[in-house]
UniProtKB/Swiss-Prot annotation:
An accessory protein needed during the final step in the assembly of 30S ribosomal subunit, possibly for assembly of the head region. Essential for efficient processing of 16S rRNA. May be needed both before and after RbfA during the maturation of 16S rRNA. It has affinity for free ribosomal 30S subunits but not for 70S ribosomes. NCBIfam families: 16S_RimM (TIGR02273). Residues 174-186 have a biased composition (Acidic residues). Its main location: cytoplasm. This is Ribosome maturation factor RimM. It is found in: Cytoplasm. The PRC barrel domain binds ribosomal protein uS19. Residues 93-166 form the PRC barrel domain. GO terms for molecular function: ribosome binding. The gene is rimM. Residues 160-186 are annotated as: Disordered. Keywords: Chaperone, Cytoplasm, Ribosome biogenesis, rRNA processing.
Amino acid sequence: MQLVVARIGRAHGIKGEVTVEVRTDEPELRLGPGAVLATDPASVGPLTIETGRVHSGRLLLRFEGVRDRNGAEALRNTLLIAEVDPDEVPEDPDEYYDHQLMDLDVVTKDGTEVGRITEISHLPSQDLFVVERSDGSEVYIPFVEEIVVEIDLEEQRAVIDPPPGLIDDRAEVDSSDTEAATEADA
């Protein structure tokens, strides 16, 4: 199974190093010297990590065969993909790999069906579940413990306790706003 572990950013210096946006909780395992990674786009790789270091809080990598700034710039925005055993699980029981969460059914605490996880977006502040509803629309659920209260891999579901307005249909939210305004005027 393949897992996106990083995205290559800008070139750093003139000797072929690049900045890397890490997308794994185990960078020392997945992004160490000697690691061979597939790429997206595939035509760029595979890439073998030659060296890695942290500079000003950013991970810098150099790949075999990339010796100058031009070569490094050509790699910009390339996704780095590691091969992962599908049975491998994170050490922390409250951590999950993307492939474990994909296609989970999402329900509220009271059992109301919301939809199915179709994508996980890794943003700087938090991860987001992209959930496809039965009508084909999408809703975005922040993957934070205050909202996602349970992940049950055996039952293939994620239980959420959404704040008002997070998953409500726009029409329902608009009608409750109108009702509240009417009551306030009375």
